[in-house]
């Protein structure tokens, strides 16, 4: 199959599974129908495969996974040969993946990959099977699964990420020479593209992790001397920062300071802020950011001040960080709902909200309650407080976890050596999450510039 056909199918699947938002009205209708579509023993009555898939997808889109699986199981039981079985298998596996039950997810993802290898669901199943193995710490096995993807689907939708995942999986397995070999394979296959740059950035990260400062500097220079940043998940500022960090660790302080100083200082670059901090610690005073513009000041208001101060004070969370997340998540719109069924000011998904509702004082929480500002802020504050404890107060890791999941953030932090903010940010493995971290931390930097911890204007 040609890559264009792959892409068309890929877009269709995610239009169908991830981005076709089921409205709250549709969810209520399906929930009501299911109450009356049951046999005497409480089991779902047999419906058409299409109807089971529709209802299951509606629950899936709203992250009500146990309810979605009831319908997917009925498809597998009643219609095992129907084309809907592939979707039922894949979404069942994905639901367990979202619930972090990776061992159970593998059962369904492996099955859809084996039984439907010529479909998009099969290809996606194989890819997510590898991801599950990574999250279980089975990195060598994950590398083999990703390599299988490269052999079976050389033009697959995830062929670039499969190569990059092999590099990181081999690195995490301690197979450094094999990881470096895959850096070269990736560079050859994707020469002149952002994927080649990502492979080189992975090499920089690996060398920093291993304390090979000279090799980290050399890899960074290879990128800076002509790599393509378009389509990559890194930037000139990030690579300069990593190079400066390697130089500093190697004892080349003046060259390190010169490299940090070459990063333009403004409030829109995450790494410029880190560079300023490192320069300031060394006594340098030439890296002062430009004053905030009138638009930057007006775009960062204090909203819901009383509620934020009430619930952040309890857990010693910086209220400016809550505002930074709120701005990014909903632009302060209390009625916001995402395609992934995240609701309200801080875009809570129902399964997360249910976990913290009792601690927050809302034991009878219903989905629509998350549109209430006080409820949303209270529950999100409980969640963020737990993340703060888990990640030792590293706000970059908290932001990454809020967007990309606790287990992913923990894995990125675990492979960050040293556990420094900029090193962690460079290790974030999802493009969306990495961009999210940068935006939240830039927001946080501006809020700290504008307001004190009581949210009074400076």
What are these regions (language model features)?
Residues 35-51, 232-234, 292-301:
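TPR-adjacent "capping" and linker segments in tetratricopeptide-repeat scaffold/adaptor proteins
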Residues 54, 91, 128, 165, ...:
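"A position-specific structural signal for the A-helix of alpha-solenoid helical repeats
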Residues 42-74, 78, 94, 98:
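Alpha-helical segment of the N-proximal tetratricopeptide repeat
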Residues 100, 124, 136, 141, ...:
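Catalytic glycan-binding domains that act on GlcNAc-containing polysaccharides
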Residues 42-47, 75-85, 113-123, 150-161, ...:
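Short solvent-exposed coil/turn linkers within tandem alpha-helical repeat scaffolds
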